[in-house]
């Protein structure tokens, strides 16, 4: 997780001072437990493509708590927030996929998914089987950390929480293509 945050600042003209590095390291350490808690919540509450309603609500609520004004309903259930909106300079987009898969949870963990959803007309178990829960939690933590140092970022950062990355249900549009329309 630490390396994601360092990659984010490569685009900027920020000082590489030891003091700045220590500040970022401290912010990361301060947010690790919350990131894990968020990941567990998203894992327990996995939703299928274009049905990520609770997921989107939680993402938007977390972003508002930080200080963002997120746009919801993007590409049906996507969420977008912008750091330093309107600020001159480079613009960087960071994306996390938020949908789960029609897969039964087999792990015996306290945060196992017990969610179900309708897939091809049948009720099926749903879980995050390929890391979208982690992607979402890490991007939220990244948004929080960058918000803390926003005055030192010489441009904008767009946080994109994309629904339906695994593919929209039959007969529906969804995913990245809708996000950029």
Question: Model segments located where?
Answer:
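Positively charged n-region of N-terminal signal peptides that target proteins for export
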Residues: 1-4
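N-terminal signal peptide c-region/cleavage motif recognized by signal peptidases
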Residues: 10-14
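Acidic/His- and Gly-rich active-site-bordering loop/insert found
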Residues: 19-128, 137-158
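Fold-level recognition of mixed alpha/beta catalytic cores in primary-metabolism enzymes, strongest
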Residues: 153-181
